[in-house]
Amino acid sequence: GDVYKRQGHAALINVQRICDYVATGLTFDQAIELVRASSLYTVHTPVPAGHDYFDEGLFGKYMGGYPSKMGISWDDLMDLGRNNPGDKGERFCMSVFACNTSQEVNGVSWLHGKVSQEMFSSIWKGYFPEESHVGYVTNGVHFPTWSATEWKQLYAKYFNESFLYDQSNPKIWEAIYNVPDEEIWKTRVTMKNKLVDYIRKQFRETWLKNQGDPSRIVSLLDKINPNALLIGFGRRFATYKRAHLLFTDLERLSKIVNNPDYPVQFLFTGKAHPHDGAGQGLIKRIVEISQRPEFLGKIIFLENYDMQLARRLVSGVDIWLNTPTRPLEASGTSGEKALMNGVLNFSVLDGWWLEGYREGAGWALTEKRTYQNQEHQDQLDAATIYSILETEILPLYYARNKKGYSEGWIRSVKNSIAQIAPHLSLIHI
């Protein structure tokens, strides 16, 4: 049967498959051709930490008995995991082995496909990167899982009944333009209130336990304002995600969050890998900043990030913020989940957003790097975020009509759903 490897971690399954074919009487060359013809491999990140390398000694401790079963030498097996076969000093790479034993390799967005072609180009010497068998399949999301019940009910009310079976049909999604603005606004308000209630209920006990001073915690919880613009940031705290970017200029950020005419609050959540000291340091810094008087109740870090909290966030905030270092965001899917719930994206043009972004349906930071120096680039991107918040996002959100909502904001929500969502749904029967 066919085998699909979603990460390099699973690559060694093809060692066993080759052994099994050789045991039936095939030669190694015949066996590896069969294995390649029935193997697909998805690479999920260009970040080095996502690609396992093993020293020959450690690899041999566990894999030393396999070459004889495969009908090859130990060096032959090692070379299948090396960019430069024959280089005794090169470690065995699971990702290289996955490429060498798979018919097709794919990244998880158009840009990531291009990055992966360059990253693996040394495997296929003598070929241009675009000539390799590395392509892309942009990640999507499972609409029934990540759309809130309220949104599914709204879609069922206004969309063609075939929507359940053909969620990638743009014509069906265009029916969102027929939904009254008031109904979309009401649904958004409902989801925000649910998020705020969830936070107050779930985190009162946690924060009291971990942060002491009950009066301060109660005050903080009371400051969470469902009428303010809520901006969410929830993901793994890997350094390339740049969770720190918003805090580059604290004086300017303080002016933004304390503007009485345009109230805005930021909700941060996520976890760092246990061995990622830098990621843990980012969380620590955000928590410390959130406890300063000028940011108390304006910058909020939510502990114990899990699927339930993620589901509440992607349906309850107004804007989903994503600030990765270009081009290290392979795809990202949290913004796709948010979009299904009428949440607008504000992100660097990287990963899925490079393909998804449409003018008038969210906001974007350019995909191009202005500076090679990352610190300078961070400063520029932070200034751009502040500027877009001050001059575009906040004025649009608070341009309220007599009925209490922003017609321009609802127009952007409708554009986002109609023009982007059908390209992200996984269901098409």
Q: PLM features: residue spans?
A:
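Catalytic cores of carbohydrate-active enzymes across secretory and cytosolic contexts
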Residues: G1-I427
